[in-house]
């Protein structure tokens, strides 16, 4: 007799699971138009605000900020994906709310990425993956490395996004039966790099192993590599060519 029967989880039931996670995140505070603080969080409020007001509408990924006395090169050396997400939220919500939605978005995406990574080819939801993701983000043994809730609220949301996207990249590469899985996987891994470098360095050997092992044609693998380069080359080029100024 099986302890657990493999019963399909409906989309409605999935919503219930994620509502539990959302309740933990105190949406009543998220939608107050206030500025988040704590740890490095306050230091991220200013550059993202400057990005939205001076770069985003000009389709500019990085440039010179006039803040901090004589100014400094903004988003040449740090990762722009969270700023882009905040800009999109800011089209609808005030900046303070948009910033907080971006932050908690990284937490929900991390839970989802674990759940997706734990799925088998036949299932549409993994309760064990969901529990693993929820357990990870609620871990309190570290508060600054990134990935868990405590670190994210201390300003490490870039790291959290990077972990989530790396998980999704591997999940789509190994668990998806869609014809475009190599494309989706490359997009997610590109987003991971645009969020933070350290998780990419950790995940890269694992991703490369499954990328080589994947039963895709040479053309499909080549196209996925081009997509990854297309997404990341603008940021990585400016980073590498200006590295001497860090």
Predicted features along the sequence, with ranges:
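Membrane-embedded transmembrane-helix bundle of lipid-linked glycan/lipid transferases
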Residues: 1-246
